């Protein structure tokens, strides 16, 4: 069996990234990606079983970064922050970390959150929000705040949609930081009002 020509991998990744960024997953074509990379469609399928596998290879590592960041912030961190009056400082820290990931991996984030319709990666964002919402609802309920997980999930979906808007509008990091700071001021006030009402 002939050895795979790994020198083509970079060309394929670059071609795929550009194709998906320009037309999205649904409208992207393996034939066009192969042509962009200067290889045959057969050579492309030798490396990637299908379009979905190729798309996933571009966004998988970035998805892991978000999961790692979200799992690092434990419920007890919120408990302490609320008790010490530092809730806004904690959410600002989390927002900063999310923006760091976005702007360190902008194209990959744009693909994952704005171009993934029709791919298996399309499910990533709602699953991420649902997981975060369940974690938050468990924390709130365990601390005497009877808030349905559905309520938390809707609030979380609205909150994280700010970041998708930043991506869609292609703001600079400086612009995004200022915008997110403003909307988090609004969001934090709502969360604290809800928390205090339920305590």
Short names for language-model regions:
Residues 56-62, 124:
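Alpha-helical DNA-contacting segments of helix-turn-helix folds
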Residues 1-4:
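N-terminal intrinsically disordered/low-complexity leader segments
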Residues 61-73:
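Short, solvent-exposed beta-strand-terminating loops
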């Amino acid at each position: 069996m002939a050895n795979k020509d790994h020198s083509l991998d970079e060309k394929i990744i670059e071609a795929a990234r550009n194709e998906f960024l320009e037309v999205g997953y649904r409208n992207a074509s393996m034939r066009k990606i192969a042509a962009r990379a200067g290889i045959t469609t057969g050579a492309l399928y030798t490396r990637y079983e299908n379009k979905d596998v190729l798309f996933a290879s571009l966004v998988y590592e970035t998805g892991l970064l978000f999961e790692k960041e979200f799992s690092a912030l434990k419920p007890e961190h919120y408990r302490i922050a609320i008790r010490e009056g530092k809730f806004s400082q904690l959410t600002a820290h989390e927002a900063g970390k999310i923006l760091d990931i976005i702007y360190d991996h902008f194209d990959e984030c744009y693909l994952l959150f704005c171009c993934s319709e029709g791919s298996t990666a399309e499910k990533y964002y709602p699953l991420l929000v649902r997981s975060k919402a369940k974690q938050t609802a468990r924390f709130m309920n365990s601390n005497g705040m009877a808030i349905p997980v559905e309520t938390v999930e809707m609030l979380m979906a609205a909150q994280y949609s700010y970041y998708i808007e930043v991506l869609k509008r292609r703001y600079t990091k400086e612009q995004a930081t200022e915008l997110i700071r403003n909307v988090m001021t609004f969001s934090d006030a709502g969360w604290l009002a809800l928390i205090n009402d339920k305590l």
